Curated annotation (Swiss-Prot):
Residues 121-133, 214-224 have a biased composition (Acidic residues). The lineage of its organism: Eukaryota, Metazoa, Chordata, Craniata, Vertebrata. It catalyses: ATP + H2O = ADP + phosphate + H(+). It comes from Mus musculus. One of its GO terms (biological process) is positive regulation by host of viral transcription. Signal peptide: none annotated. Component of the SAGA complex. Specifically interacts with methylated H3K4me2 and H3K4me3. Interacts with the FACT complex, the PAF complex and the U2 snRNP. Interacts directly with PAF1, SFA3A1, SFA3A2, SFA3A3, SNF2 and SSRP1. Interacts with BCLAF1, NCoR, SRP20 and SAFB. Residues 491-661 form the Helicase ATP-binding domain. Its main location: nucleus. This is Chromodomain-helicase-DNA-binding protein 1.
Length: 1711
């Protein structure tokens, strides 16, 4: 396409970079050019007739009309208006103007292209389109940042392809001023309809433009699906925002330059991204006048509308795809249809959902409606934030008519990937402060620099007597005294060069002290950063807010979000492009992002690293710890409320992190402080003083009101008692094992009982239709729990008093029940648990804390974040169920009892009397008191027990004996009540309950810290407790479960179980089959399972009776995987499969699986568990698999369970094996790795970018470092230099993930071959004697690798096929390559010495064709196009042999055609050259290179000739019933030996003869290895047969290889092949007794061969059904089975063969 357009000159005035030619429009802020730039087919056909003289002249016109009146209008009226003034007067027009440019660009591109091509040929235009695509698409990828960067590709005019005449025509026809706009005639409802001429000055908003971000990719995808016409198909990249704008309205002021351009037939339209809201509004109050900025300027067209008095329309608030929320408009269904917008399905879905909601609201109770309305209000508030600019991150280089650049805006509550370009005039009117801050940041002199002198030498400390003016921000906030002291302590530590731990108790303002300290460094010592703050996601917004409040002069960037967001930050927020100095002072990020981008973030020298919630670093073996400790930093600060949790080792880990030189050895630290509690901690306290500061509230906040805790004990309801007894009875067997039982079993029972103590619904939820009305439902809800009966009374009393309540529970399902209860009672509440994320969480907290808030309750999960959640506006805390870990409950209380609290805080802990809950509380009290008292002397707070060993499991502080005793607690009393006569708890007045409650007030006293730690425990007198008292009493008087649970209840349970078993025995056959199948697929048999459970070696009868366990995969008991949840195990296994040698790559796996808190020991334990479990599962299932033979259908393969996670053993091991070559090839040392280059020659990758050997090497390094499939991570690593090469923004450009996967598979195969080749050379070098030994040992080795072979044969085709391929490649090509190398060394041609050391002629090595040659080859090979396409696409459902035959036939057809083509040449050099060229062309259709294909073809020809000769021979020999076969004859010569020598004809012996005959093909043949146990008769197969299979085996492997990209198990398992082949060969080699039969077959074959020109050995390629038929109809010695197309052997050989073969192998030959 040619020609500069007036569109471009217009853009120059509006802040767009001028571009033309191929890149027309692609750099616009909206990105429209690129999309349209790629459409050519449609436009060339549309405009073909009439654009020959006019198309290029009016190329810039977006929607050209053919009426001349419009042109006259343009020439008559070109007035100019000051853009800024005009906009101020008519802001509502903005939405119209924003699209003017967008809609011009696509048309311009379409009209210019036909002018340049003029071919009208669809093929030509599409090929020119391809080249356009590549350049314009490339520009489009960068349009996010190039519009504003001076160095961006948007600024230079890319006019290389433009013809001068076109340029001049453009210049002469248009003067390119901003006012060149003209009204169009078609009105869109989104635009105001009566302002046509006044808008001339305003082209501007093209840039407000679409968001240029990841949403464009979505546009493209949606668009791809649409493809409504040929033009659309070409225009894959169009984004909808432009699409709709193609339609021109009378309100769009565009100038038509020159003559008319024909109107396109197919227009492109806007797309609905989301329907945000719905209303009934005034008729006509829709379109552009309803945007937020138009409403602010002109007023709301819907204002004052009353539904009763005037008719209205149902209107929908539309978020347009590619536009920010500020441009949302109200539309009716009618106006949307008029505009022909896309995405109407979204509107239909919204309407359906809205109708459902309305129906529900009609029948819902008032409190449900209230709850719904509150939720809606929160959502609306959130949506409003999307219209507020948080910060501006870029501006365009050129200014618009209004004299303002466009701005790139980040919106509040949305990630960076949702940034969008907006019009300068609009943003300056609404968000001028953001613009000022942006320019202030850009011009700031206070950016980090490396030569700051205080980094090299710390200054002398000068104490701050009063708060400096720079701290406190604009609002003049004041630090409290202790916070100023804390700031001084932090400053003192920094000056002394001590990194430190700020361990103030929760609620004392650690965040503010940290920010003030950074502010101090910034102002006092001119240290401007960079400061890195690593914080949990939950507190990130509060950190951001506090930085803005307390240190607004510092530029803090939040480094968060998906890869697009982070790339955006790196592009715009990271550094100044000119000076390369960092822009930010503080970088805020989370642990997870830090680990994802550790290579990038770890490359900076940080002046300061601060870690919030630093107890996450307590494990010095975790990946997070190892990653962060390696970061380069000048000073470190850890911020934690709980520096000491479980052991002294954890405290040492924190100290080692901040001061690795001082606290270098744990052993020394333990020796010094770990022993002797009397004096050890005093010395420790002294040593810690310079590094650790901890204050508690009572020490510093005298004003903090009292905290009173009461333990309220209540009885269970009757239903709870029933359920409680039922749980114990049901688990009688597990309980009666006592200390022999499993911890996990006891814990599970205990969790069930704890659920029962909370509420019956947690055990058995009610049916939906169980209750008739709300009142009944509420009563049942309350009566189902003793705790809720009490809570109900308590809340009613608190509501009367005006208290506000926080209710904590560990169980989210319990929170659901409480929420339901609160709705029934119509108590307004908020809720926060782990599932409520980010912005919604913030909204809920703010809503509860707001002045005059109506909220009465706040439901919280006890563990909802560590979290700095401040709910000081509440004065009552109800702990519904106590946590195992008292510190969690303590944190819960601190949500309310913290700075800012004015009232006394009452804490009510609910405990069920006579249940496990009560006993847990008592035991925890006894067990933990002493240790907490010790901790208090150190003035540090810990969670549980202080001891020097490693931490006990935080989830279960009790051992089996204690758990057993806890479970018995209260059970006896409970069973004394007869079943069905359980008493309801007696009614009691709430005041009476509170009076009786165990109460504890936290008055300050000498033991206040201990009391604080044990605030949940009422301990009468600490001093009376000697250590002896703490010892837990043994279960002296405890009864057995037989005595506790009545016998009749036990009998009834057993009877129920028996009935269940009988039911299962008679269950439907279909269900039985299903169970069997599960058992076959994954689980071990009943026998091994019963052994495991019962401990006996034989089948236990009771186990055999239990069909219900039949299909359960084996489970590794939970004790083995302590510390990992099921979700974590799943993540671990997913990552485990991405790495070769996974047990050596645990750090990478932990990073990928986000398990960085786990220690290497735990990870190794889990890794070994996975690996050993897989191997064992495969071993156990091998017999079953063999029996199944080549079963059709998908075989899932053996599975086993780790905890609750099912693992497919076959798949895991397959992935492990597949990636071993990569693991072995890439150096583990990072420095060596940087130098790595792939040692093999690689075929060119046909990507849309330059891709060479270096990129292949970097891709492999990336896979090694980040795991197979982690393409995003690989893209982000700057060291790999693939950032701009892989995963381009344009989804139509390669390489995307699919291409990368294919390339990676290919490269790993090359590595595998290379390794195999080297190994073979090493073995060759070892000499012949060793080789003989190897062969002798082979049979032994086979046993050891049985499991591995099983894996390979069964698993995803990749690994096994790869090994086959490696060996084949070796076996096939090694002898020839030796010969070839000898020749090539002699020849004069230049050679290239490869990594394997073999010279390859340079001419041969390069297998690329230039474009011209490629085109010639393409034409010449057109007659065999079908064969080329089918070469790697056999029909589905073919057996492997049929596939193989299919390939051979294709190859013969192609080769014959090439031979025909070469006949026109007489010059031998030409023939040689063109033969090579044509075969290189053929190689593009398959994985094999040209040489290999040619070789295979030659071999096929040879076979064809032999087959013809043999068929002649066969017809002659048939009369004598003998087929001559040199190999057979040779074999017969040896039959004169005695039996022993006959028997010694093992596989190896025969093969050695064969090797002599056909060069040495023995080394590394894994294929033969795997056959060894499946094909006992293969050793006697005749030599030709061997050769035959080997020559073509690669092809079938290749097909399987291709299949792996579709479905791993689509074809039958690979075992099937050897067994078929073995079976066939057996038949071929049996002796011939039935001569007539034999003759019949050979006659048949000879006739068919002449007909089909097939090799005599094609007999091998029988279809599956024939083989099945023959196998079924004949025994091993039946006449039919003994026919052979080749020679025969004597009966002696036959019997010898049978003697050497175990009889059972016949079963494995079944197909």
């Amino acid at each position: 396409m040619n020609g500069h357009s007036d569109e471009e000159s217009v853009r120059n005035g509006s802040g767009e970079s001028s571009q033309s030619g191929d890149d027309c429009g692609s750099a616009s802020g909206s990105g429209s050019g690129s999309s349209s730039g790629s459409s050519s087919d449609g436009s060339s056909s549309q405009s073909g007739s009439s654009d020959s003289d006019s198309g290029s002249d009016s190329g810039s016109q977006s929607e050209s009309e053919s009426d001349t009146s419009r042109e006259n209008k343009v020439q008559a009226k070109p007035p100019k208006v000051d853009g800024a003034e005009f906009w101020k007067s008519s802001p509502s027009i903005l939405a119209v103007q924003r699209s003017a440019m967008l809609r011009k660009q696509p048309q311009q591109a379409q009209q210019q292209r036909p002018a340049s091509s003029n071919s009208g040929s669809e093929e030509d235009s599409s090929s020119s389109e391809d080249s356009d695509d590549s350049s314009s698409g490339a520009k489009r990828k960068k349009h996010n940042d190039e519009d504003w960067q001076m160095s961006g590709s948007g600024s230079p005019s890319q006019s290389g392809s433009d013809s001068e005449s076109e340029e001049e025509r453009d210049k002469s026809s248009c003067d390119g001023t901003e006012s060149d706009y003209e009204p169009k005639n078609k009105v869109r409802s989104r635009k105001p309809q009566n302002r046509s001429k006044s808008k001339n000055g305003k082209k501007i908003l093209g840039q407000k433009k679409r968001q240029i971000d990841s949403s464009e990719d979505e546009d493209d995808e949606d668009y791809d699906n649409d493809k409504r016409s040929s033009r659309r198909q070409a225009t894959v990249n169009v984004s909808y925002k432009e699409d709709e704008e193609m339609k021109t309205d009378s309100d769009d002021l565009l100038e038509v330059c020159g003559e008319d351009v024909p109107q396109p037939e197919d227009e492109e339209f806007e797309t609905i991204e989301r329907v945000m809201d719905c209303r009934v509004g005034r008729k006509g109050a829709t379109g552009a006048t309803t945007t937020i900025y138009a409403v602010e300027a002109d007023g709301d067209p819907n204002a004052g509308f009353e539904r009763n008095k005037e008719p209205g329309d149902i209107q929908y608030l539309i978020k347009w795809k590619g536009w920010s929320h500020i441009h949302n408009t109200w539309e009716t269904e009618e106006t949307l249809k008029q505009q022909n917008v896309r995405g109407m399905k979204k509107l239909d879905n919204y309407k359906k959902k809205d109708q459902e909601t309305k129906r529900w609201l009609k029948n819902a109770s008032p409190e449900d409606v209230e709850y719904y309305n509150c939720q809606q209000e929160l959502t609306d508030d959130l949506h409003k934030q999307y219209q507020i600019v948080e910060r501006i991150i870029a501006h365009s280089n050129q200014k618009s008519a209004a004299g303002l650049p466009d701005y790139y805006c980040k919106w509040q509550g949305l990630p960076y990937s949702e940034c969008s370009w907006e019009d300068g005039a609009l943003i300056s009117k609404k968000f001028q402060t953001c613009i000022d801050e942006y320019f202030s940041r850009n011009q700031s002199k206070t950016t980090p620099f490396k030569d700051c002198k205080v980094l090299k030498q710390r200054p002398r400390f000068v104490a701050l007597k009063k708060q400096p003016s720079y701290i406190g921000g604009h609002e003049g906030l004041e630090l409290r005294d202790y916070q100023l002291n804390g700031l001084n302590w932090l400053a003192h530590s920094w000056c002394k060069g001590n990194s430190c731990i700020l361990a103030d108790e929760m609620g004392l303002g650690k965040t503010i002290q940290t920010i003030s300290f950074l502010n101090y460094l910034f102002h006092e010592h001119q240290l401007y950063g960079p400061f890195l703050l690593v914080v949990p996601l939950s507190t990130l917004t509060s950190w951001q807010r506090e930085i803005q409040t307390w240190a607004s002069q510092m530029n803090a960037v939040v480094y968060l979000g998906d890869i697009n967001s982070r790339n955006m930050i790196r592009t715009h927020e990271w550094m100044h492009p000119q000076t390369k100095r960092l822009k930010f002072n503080i970088l805020l990020t989370t642990y997870e992002i830090l680990l994802k981008d550790k290579a990038f973030l770890g490359g900076l020298n940080w002046a300061f690293i601060g870690v919030d919630e630093a107890h996450r670093l307590k494990n010095d073996d975790s990946l997070l710890y190892k990653t962060l400790i390696d970061f380069k930093s000048n000073h470190r600060l850890l911020i934690t409320g709980t520096p000491l949790q479980n052991s002294l080792k954890e405290l040492w880990s924190l100290l080692h992190f901040i001061m690795p030189e001082k606290f270098s050895s744990w052993e020394d630290f333990e020796e010094e402080h770990g022993k002797g509690r009397e004096y050890g901690y005093a010395s420790l306290h002294k040593e810690l003083e310079p590094f650790l500061l901890r204050r508690v509230k009572k020490d510093v906040e005298k004003s903090l009101p009292a905290k009173v805790e009461q333990i309220l004990r209540m009885e269970m309801s009757a239903l709870q008692k029933q359920y409680y007894k039922w749980i114990l009875t049901r688990n009688y067997k597990a309980l009666s094992k006592g200390s022999k039982g499993s911890t996990s079993g006891f814990l599970n029972i205990m969790m069930e009982l704890k659920k029962c103590c909370n509420h019956c619904y947690l055990i058995k939820p009610p049916d939906n239709n169980e209750f008739y009305n709300k009142q009944e439902a509420l009563q049942h809800l309350i009566r189902s729990s003793g705790k809720l009966i009490l809570l109900d009374k308590l809340l009613i009393r608190l509501r009367e008093r005006g208290n506000r309540v926080l209710i904590f529970s560990q169980m989210v399902r319990m929170l659901d029940i409480l929420a339901e209860y609160l709705k029934y009672r119509q108590f307004p509440f908020q809720r926060l648990d782990g599932s409520i994320k980010g912005e919604l969480r913030k909204q809920a907290l703010d809503h509860f804390n707001a002045e005059g808030s109506e909220d009465f309750c706040f439901l919280l999960s006890t563990r909802a974040g560590g979290l700095g959640i401040n709910l000081a506006s509440a004065d009552t805390v109800v702990i519904f169920d106590s946590d195992w870990n008292p510190q969690n409950d303590l944190q819960a209380q601190a949500r309310a009892h913290r700075i800012g609290q004015k009232k006394q805080v009452n804490i009510y802990r609910l405990v069920t009397k006579g249940s496990v809950e009560e006993d847990i509380l008592e035991r925890a009290k006894k067990k933990m008191v002493l240790d907490h008292l010790v901790i208090q002397r150190m003035d540090t707070t810990g969670k549980t027990v202080l001891h020097t060993g490693s931490a006990p499991s935080s989830s279960t502080p009790f051992n089996k004996e204690e758990l057993s005793a806890i479970l018995k607690f209260g059970a006896e009393e409970l069973f004394k009540e007869p079943e069905g006569e359980e008493q309801e708890p007696q009614e009691m007045d709430i005041d009476e309950i509170l009076k009786r409650a165990e109460t504890h007030e936290n008055e300050p006293g000498p033991l206040s810290v201990g009391d604080e730690l044990l605030s949940q425990f009422k301990v009468a007198n600490f001093s009376n407790m000697d250590e002896d008292d703490i010892e837990l009493e043994p279960e002296r008087n405890s009864k057995n479960w037989e005595e506790i649970i009545p016998e009749e209840q036990r009998r009834r349970l057993e009877e129920e179980e028996r009935q269940k078993e009988l039911e299962e025995i008679y269950m439907l056959p279909r269900m039985r089959n299903c169970a069997k199948q599960i058992s076959f697929n994954g689980s071990e048999g009943r026998r091994s399972r019963s052994r495991r459970y019962s401990g006996s070696d034989s089948d236990s009868i009771s186990e055999r009776k239990r069909p219900k366990k039949r299909g359960r995969p084996r489970t590794i008991p939970r004790e083995n995987i302590k510390g990992f949840s099921d979700a974590e195990i799943r993540r671990f296994i997913k990552s485990y499969k991405k790495f070769g040698g996974p047990l050596e790559r645990l750090d990478a796996i932990a990073r990928d699986a986000e398990l960085v808190d786990k220690s290497e020991t735990d990870l190794r334990r889990l890794g070994e568990l996975v690996h050993n479990g897989c191997v064992k599962a495969l071993k156990d299932s091998s017999s079953g698999t063999e029996r199944a033979g080549g079963r059709l259908g998908k075989v899932k393969g053996p599975t086993f369970r780790i905890s609750g996670v099912q693992v497919n053993a076959k798949l895991v091991i397959a992935h492990e094996d597949e990636l071993i070559p990569l693991h072995k090839s890439i150096p583990s040392d990072p420095e060596e790795r940087k130098q790595y280059t792939i040692p093999c020659h690689t075929k060119a990758a046909h990507f849309d970018i330059d891709w060479g050997k270096e990129d292949d090497s970097n891709l492999l390094i990336g896979i090694y470092e980040y795991g197979y499939g982690s393409w995003e991570m690989i893209k982000m690593d700057p060291d790999l230099s693939l950032t701009h090469k892989i995963l381009p923004d344009d989804p139509d450009k390669k390489p995307q993930a699919k291409q990368l996967q294919t390339r990676a598979d290919y490269l790993i195969k090359l590595l595998s071959r290379d390794l195999a080749k080297r190994e073979a050379q090493r073995l060759c070098g070892a000499g012949g004697s060793k080789r003989r030994k190897t062969r002798a040992k082979k049979s032994k080795a086979m046993k050891s690798i049985k499991v591995k072979e099983e894996i390979k044969s069964d698993s995803s085709p990749l690994p096994s096929e790869k090994s086959d391929e490696d060996d084949d490649k070796l076996n096939d090509s090694k002898p020839e390559s030796k010969d070839r190398s000898k020749k090539s060394v002699v020849s004069d041609a230049p050679v290239h010495i490869t990594a394997s050391g073999e010279p390859v002629p340079i001419a041969e090595e390069s297998e690329e064709l230039d474009q011209k040659t490629f085109s010639i080859c393409k034409e010449r090979m057109r007659p065999v196009k079908a064969a080329l396409k089918q070469l790697d696409r056999p029909e589905k459902g073919l057996s492997e042999r049929e596939q193989l035959e299919h390939t051979r036939q294709c190859l013969i057809k192609i080769g014959d055609h090439i031979t025909e083509c070469l006949k026109e040449y007489s010059n031998p050099e030409q023939i040689k050259q063109w033969r090579k060229n044509l075969w290189i062309f053929v190689s593009k259709f398959t994985e094999f290179d040209a040489r290999k294909l040619h070789k295979l073809y030659k071999h096929a020809i040879k076979k064809r000739q032999e087959s013809q000769q043999n068929s002649d021979q066969n017809s002659n020999v048939a009369t004598t019933h003998v087929i001559r076969n040199p190999d057979m004859e040779r074999l017969k010569e040896n039959t004169n030996h005695d039996d022993s020598s006959r028997d010694s004809y093992s596989s190896d012996r025969h093969l050695s003869q064969y090797h002599d005959h056909h060069k040495d093909r023995h080394q590394g043949d894994s294929y033969k290895k795997s056959d060894s146990r499946k094909r006992p008769y293969s050793s006697f197969s005749n030599g030709k047969d061997h050769r035959e299979w080997d020559h073509y085996r690669q092809d079938s492997r290749y097909y399987s290889d291709r299949e792996k990209h579709r479905k791993l198990d689509d074809h039958r398992s690979r075992e099937h092949r050897p067994s078929l082949e073995g079976g066939l060969k057996d038949r071929c080699h049996s002796d011939h007794r039935s001569h007539s039969d034999h003759r019949m077959h050979s006659d048949h074959r000879s006739s068919s061969e002449h007909t089909h020109h097939k090799s005599s050995r094609d007999y091998r390629y029988l279809s599956d059904w024939q083989l099945d038929h023959r196998a079924a109809s004949s025994g091993p010695r039946s006449p039919l089975d003994q026919r052979s197309p080749y020679g025969s052997r004597s009966p002696f050989e036959h019997s010898a063969e049978h003697r050497s073969t175990p009889e059972h192998t016949w079963s494995s030959r079944k197909t």
